[in-house]
Amino acid sequence: MALPRNVIPMPRSRFLRVKCIDCGNEQIVFSHPATRVRCNVCGATLVEPTGGKGIIRAKILEVLE
C-alpha cells in the first residue's frame, strides 16, 4: 500500500542558480546557507545567512530540484 505524499515531509530548501548583479557570473547556491556566499569572480555577496532562509542579493535564474 502506497503512502500519501503529504505523510512524508519534503525539504523546503532548494539549490538556486543565481546571477551576480555586479559582474554577471552565474553560480549555484543553497537557499538556506550557514555562511555568507560570495561571487567566485568579483567577491560580491550573493546570499547572506539569517538562521533560516538566506537573504538573496542576486537575481534568481532557476530553482533546481
From Swiss-Prot:
Cofactors (names): Zn(2+)
Amino acids binding Zn(2+): C20, C23, C39, C42
HAMAP family according to UniProt: Ribosomal_eS27 (MF_00371)
Pfam families, per database record: Ribosomal_S27e
Gene that encodes the chain: rps27e
Organism: Pyrococcus abyssi (strain GE5 / Orsay)
Assembly description: Part of the 30S ribosomal subunit.
Name of this protein: Small ribosomal subunit protein eS27
Gene Ontology molecular function terms on file: structural constituent of ribosome; zinc ion binding
Zinc finger intervals, C4-type: 20-42
BP terms from Gene Ontology: translation
